[in-house]
Structure formats: C-alpha cells, structure tokens
C-alpha cells in the first residue's frame, strides 16, 4: 500500500435524470402539467438549474421551454412577491 494515496469516496449520491430513467414520465412534460413543472421551479418562481435537479441537458431544455409556455399563458407565475 506504499506509494499510492488512498482515493477519497464521494459522499454525495450521483444524480440521475428521472426522465431518462422513466420514459413515460418524459412524455408527461407539458405546459398544462403544472404539478410536474412546479417541482422544477423555486418558491420565488425561478427555474432550478440542472446541476441541482440532476436533469439531463435535453430534458432541462424541454422543461424550461414548457415552464416559459405556462408562464406566458398565466398558469405559472413569473415571480412571487
């Protein structure tokens, strides 16, 4: 065991995209599905970044587009006071 230092274990669990893991859930991403979209915005109305949610880049773009659609027709707030 001499010569090589021990590797540190990562104490954080690797985030897995829930839409890649479950294709049926990916089909439910829609601007009318407010319950799903609200999981990806903060209580102040901001979109949560993918480094926090673990969403893949592809589905983060889809989510952001659908959140913007829902905001434009008034289903989601732009910001909360």
From Swiss-Prot:
Protein name: Small ribosomal subunit protein bS18
InterPro entries according to UniProt: Ribosomal_bS18, Ribosomal_bS18_CS, Ribosomal_bS18_sf
Functional summary from the UniProt entry: Binds as a heterodimer with protein bS6 to the central domain of the 16S rRNA, where it helps stabilize the platform of the 30S subunit.
Record-linked NCBIfam families: S18
Cellular component terms (Gene Ontology): cytosolic small ribosomal subunit
Keywords attached to this entry: Ribonucleoprotein, Ribosomal protein, RNA-binding, rRNA-binding
MF GO annotations: small ribosomal subunit rRNA binding; structural constituent of ribosome
Subunit structure: Part of the 30S ribosomal subunit. Forms a tight heterodimer with protein bS6.
One record GO biological process: translation
Gene3D superfamilies in the cross-refs: Ribosomal protein S18
SUPFAM superfamilies: Ribosomal protein S18 (SSF46911)
Family membership noted in the UniProt record: Belongs to the bacterial ribosomal protein bS18 family.
Residues in coiled coil: none
């Amino acid at each position: 065991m001499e010569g090589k230092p021990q590797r540190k274990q990562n104490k954080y669990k690797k985030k897995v995209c829930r839409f890649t893991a479950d294709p049926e859930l990916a089909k439910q991403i829609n601007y009318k599905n407010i319950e799903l979209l609200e999981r990806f915005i903060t209580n102040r109305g901001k979109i949560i970044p993918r480094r926090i949610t673990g969403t893949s880049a592809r589905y983060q773009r889809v989510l952001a587009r659908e959140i913007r659609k829902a905001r434009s027709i008034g289903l989601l707030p732009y910001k909360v006071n």
